[in-house]
Amino acid sequence: MKASNILLLPGWQNSGPDHWQSRWEAAHGYQRVEQHDWMRPLRGDWSARLEETVADADGPVVLAAHSLGCILTAWWAAHTRHAAKVRGALLVAPGDVERPDLAAQIHGWAPIARQPLPFPAVLVGSRNDPYCSFECAEGLAQAWGARFVDYGERGHINAESGLGDWPDGHALLHTLLKD
């Protein structure tokens, strides 16, 4: 699979230079799905951009999503005509946009789509993620039919988690490439 067919789906406010997604983009040439507005995300706009990117891909794709990018993946998968192009999805630290504090900041993303994903997926959750309880992450993995990986106490599994290039995550991504 071409590196540009591995699509990076950052969450709200994008992923900064020290985030594992940005490091993977720089090191491996993976393609970030650029959204029009990272600060005021609109589910319809973000989903349309993902639809366009997958449709334009010249072969199968694998998704590597973080936070709101996971919620986007589930919503998009429920409505797309291009699910067959997705070989798999790595879903990392989904944001619980149904929580009142997050729903107040990120409008229009609730409810979370909870149908089984039409492609293989691995969901990585943290026991002390400030944006999603461990129980919620487990529940989303079950609803989506994703294999759940308990990543211990790693916060939001982002730059602040001190993961660097996050080789563990890259190994999980490669399990999806082999399937």
Summary of predicted features, one role per range:
Residues 31, 142-158:
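Catalytic histidine neighborhood in serine/cysteine hydrolases
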Residues 159-174:
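Post-His helix in hydrolase/transferase enzymes
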Residues 11, 34-38, 89-99:
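Active-site nucleophile loop of the alpha/beta-hydrolase fold
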Residues 117, 122-125, 129:
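Short beta-strand/loop motif that positions the catalytic acidic residue
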Residues 63-74:
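Gly/Ala-rich beta-loop-alpha elbow adjacent to hydrolase catalytic centers
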Residues 2-59:
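Active-site catalytic motif of lipid deacylating hydrolases and related acyltransferases
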Residues 62-63, 89:
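Conserved alpha/beta-hydrolase fold motif
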Residues 16, 130-136:
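Conserved alpha/beta-hydrolase "acid-adjacent" motif
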